[in-house]
Amino acid sequence: MRTAILVVCAACLFPQAIVAGEYKEVVSSYDNDFYKIDSKAILIRTENCLEDVQAQEVLITMNGRAGEMTFSESENICPILAVYGTSGYRVGNYRVDITREEENWYNIFGQDIYIRTDNCLIYATEQEGLLSVSTVGKGGSGSLHFEGEACRVIGLYKPMEL
């Protein structure tokens, strides 16, 4: 009994490094450096990945929240910066401070939540806006309003591990 308690205590004191995981998924190009897992509401953010694919099998190797994606047909490998799942926001209106990270991709300042827009050309840096969430299925949708301009929201996401 005492040995079991010591083993549990040792495991708590010395956590193991996160073991890499490998996953086979089918992905499609979503937007600049983003891919969507076709069967799930999950986005994969890559770095300088030029693969334009539709429903292609990939091997995803993850270590924590980062990793790499190997395309089955070309065998090209792209670094994965992050993986995002749906955020869980509820229908309603929210005052938020927004920063544009890249085209159609905004971060809610102070939260680990990202907004995916459709053809939004607003350049914001910690700019106050109104996020109106009208649906929550498949990542959520609605609109994002800044100083009299509005953008269509096509998803609300948060970082996750596969």
Describe these PLM feature segments.
Residues M1-A4:
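Positively charged n-region of N-terminal signal peptides that target proteins for export
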Residues L6-F14:
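Hydrophobic helical h-region of N-terminal Sec-dependent signal peptides
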Residues F14-A20:
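Sec/Tat signal peptide C-region and signal peptidase I cleavage site
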Residues G21-D38, T86-I113:
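Extracytoplasmic/periplasm-facing segments of secreted or lipoprotein envelope proteins
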Residues D31-D33, Q54-Q56, R65-G67, E102-N104, ...:
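Envelope-exposed proteins and targeting segments
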Residues Y35-I37, V58-I60, M69, I108, ...:
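Fold-core signature of tandem repeat domains
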Residues E47-T61, T117-S134:
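Short nucleic-acid-contacting surface segments enriched for D/E, G, S/T with interspersed K/R
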Residues Q56-D97, K138-L162:
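Mid-chain, structured segments of secreted extracytoplasmic proteins
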